[in-house]
Amino acid sequence: MSRTVFCQYQQCDTEGLDFAPYPGELGQRIFAQIGKAGWQAWLAHQTMLINENRLSPRDPKHRAFLEAELQKFLFERNADKPEGYVDPLGEE
């Protein structure tokens, strides 16, 4: 049986994650307050950030940037796209 959470990203009740996808307190907050669809939206946004900004997940500064963006994207809903970004699907 799946868990239901009130997703802070989607602002509705939805299917919760199966496990904390991130370490520490932030991971527990994501597990408790973000649904599967919200997490998938973050993964797509994170991929765009990594590609457009040429980030390396191995670089501590880049990881800190991504963590800050994760919090803005999921909980504050005010994450920006990189300057000059053009959606390849034209959905913007």
Swiss-Prot record:
Residues spanning the signal sequence: none
Top-level taxon: Bacteria
Residues passing through the membrane, by range: none
GO biological process, one term: cellular response to oxidative stress
InterPro entries, per database record: Fe_traffick_prot_YggX, Fe_traffick_prot_YggX_sf
A family per Pfam: Iron_traffic
UniProt keywords, alphabetically: Iron
GO molecular function: iron ion binding
One of the record's GO cellular component terms: cytosol
Annotated function: Could be a mediator in iron transactions between iron acquisition and iron-requiring processes, such as synthesis and/or repair of Fe-S clusters in biosynthetic enzymes.
Stated family: Belongs to the Fe(2+)-trafficking protein family.
Protein name, as recorded: Probable Fe(2+)-trafficking protein
Organism: Xanthomonas campestris pv. campestris (strain ATCC 33913 / DSM 3586 / NCPPB 528 / LMG 568 / P 25)
